[in-house]
């Protein structure tokens, strides 16, 4: 069993903000698989599809680890079978990469997942949102994408959803090789 969790903030107010790219990818996965997140736990909603769980916390970003831990414990999923999708300010808009482990940097949602799981040993799908040096980070990540920015991001979100679906039946190293290399070549 594998767990795929998109990080974001709940509510329509945050739907198309930079911090919610993880939620946007989960929405696309559900659309592609024709499923809904129809099961509830204390800290979020999820769907079970074949041999994996797709989930979104209903807590704010900084408390995302509660739901990841709740699902990992309930379904007995090891941290190395968890994939967390999140925004990455240190990647330019449209860049993305799969990574195994490592620190959470300044991303409070990822830091909370690390803290709650008590390990960095889980997979991440990082999606670049870029930075704006003239704006405080907390304001920037809660800003909605412009139409121009979203047109750059949309194909990346679609590809990320496809990668997550493939994660359910492929080795992560195979996906990293294929996806990260493809992104480097611009194909």
Swiss-Prot record:
Binding site for tRNA: 14, 60, 62, 108
Native source organism of the sequence: Mycoplasmopsis synoviae (strain 53) (Mycoplasma synoviae)
Transmembrane segments: none
Site feature: Stabilizes the basic form of H active site to accept a proton: 87
Protein family according to the UniProt entry: Belongs to the PTH family.
HAMAP family in the record: Pept_tRNA_hydro_bact
GO BP field: protein quality control for misfolded or incompletely synthesized proteins; rescue of stalled ribosome
Site feature location: Discriminates between blocked and unblocked aminoacyl-tRNA: 9
Database matches in PROSITE patterns: PEPT_TRNA_HYDROL_1
Catalytic activity: an N-acyl-L-alpha-aminoacyl-tRNA + H2O = an N-acyl-L-amino acid + a tRNA + H(+)
Cellular component aspect of the GO annotation: cytoplasm
Main location as per UniProt: cytoplasm
Description of how the protein assembles with itself and partners: Monomer.
Protein name in the entry: Peptidyl-tRNA hydrolase
One Pfam family per UniProt: Pept_tRNA_hydro
